Amino acid sequence: MSDIFVYPCAGRIAGVDEVGRGPLVGAVVTAAVILDPARPIAGLADSKKLSEKRRNALYDEIVEKALCWSLGRAEAEEIDRLNILQATMVAMQRAVAGLARQPDFVLIDGNRCPALPMAAQAVVKGDSRVAEISAASILAKVTRDREMAALDRQYPEYGFARHKGYPTALHLERLAALGATEHHRRSFGPVKRVLGL
């Protein structure tokens, strides 16, 4: 972990992260994780810096060893209704609320905290500085990537398994040629243009 983080004086600490703010399709997925100090997990890092194979192995280890963990989400329809930032905050609240044990303190990746019933702190680059946030980023990314692989089987012509819904040249070309699916975010510029909204 680079740029050493000084932990707050608190008993049970949860880390929270999100994946999927930028894609044009699908949910934004969040995770909250409370690690078990008695069962350390080696190699936790920002999910984006890990190979898919390593992420999947760590996902299984986190699920097995964490004191508790929970996923939250906001679907495309909710993102369109609220906006991506507000939908992400709601999804983070859902992840924290879903934890089997209530944390005393929550550390959130980024520079904003959702309203929570316990103390919380935003940590810039938290996914590479705080083990709990790294674990949350891995759970959220593996979950969302698997959802994109499932969507790819449903709509193979869009290439979702390759670009994960992000606005790559391939995705934009397929979107223009084929139109939007029911899973696309209608409030996002490229989708709006295709739909003539």
From Swiss-Prot:
Give the EC number(s) listed in the UniProt record.
3.1.26.4
Identify the InterPro entries for this entry: RNase_HII, RNase_HII/HIII, RNase_HII/HIII_dom, RNaseH-like_sf, RNaseH_sf
Which Gene3D superfamilies does the entry link to? Ribonuclease H-like superfamily/Ribonuclease H
Q: Which HAMAP family match?
A: RNase_HII_B (MF_00052_B)
Family listed = Belongs to the RNase HII family.
Function, as annotated: Endonuclease that specifically degrades the RNA of RNA-DNA hybrids.
What name has this protein been given in UniProt? Ribonuclease HII
Organism name = Edwardsiella ictaluri (strain 93-146)
